[in-house]
Amino acid sequence: WVDFPEALSEGGIRWKLLNVSPEMGAWTAIFDCPAGSSFASHVHIGPGEYFMTKGRMEVRGGEDDGGDTAVAPGYGYEPCQAYHEKTFFPENSEFYMTFLGPLNFTGPNGETVALVTWADAQAAWEASI
């Protein structure tokens, strides 16, 4: 496990890159998310599939605020252009996800902070191990 970049998350999220597929523009990782941690605002440029292995994940504010809450064990799908202002983990959580295409982390005015492709994920992983 290595730390996920703090510029793109809060609360000590860790990750492991499991696979990259340059021919598909895809990358797969598993994430360890402590209680109270979150990912910064982002847009799924391409679709993604995940499986929660432990805990809970609140997307778009969670069910109580009109969003979704994923509970382990459980499968989820993110369509193209899905926007998440904040993805929050109210308890210790872990999930496996495949991203088909880039993940666009955005700032407060919608500007791109980081566009994470399979190559960027691979470079970040290799630099951290």
State each model region's role.
Residues 1-25, 67, 111-129:
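A short, N-terminal "cap"/entry segment at the start of jelly-roll beta-barrel domains
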Residues 15-17, 28-32, 49, 67, ...:
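Conserved hydrophobic/aromatic beta-strand scaffold that supports enzyme active sites
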Residues 22, 57-89:
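Short acidic-glycine-tyrosine-enriched beta hairpin
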Residues 23-25, 35-37, 56, 82, ...:
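Short, charged/polar surface micro-motifs in flexible loops or helix N-caps
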Residues 32, 44, 65-74, 111-113:
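"Short basic amphipathic alpha-helical interaction patches in structured regions
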Residues 34-35, 44-63:
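Glycine- and acidic-residue-biased ligand/ion/polar-headgroup-sensing regions
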Residues 42-44, 84-85:
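Histidine-centered active-site/metal-ligand motif
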Residues 49, 77, 90-107:
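A short hydrophobic beta-strand segment most commonly corresponding to one strand
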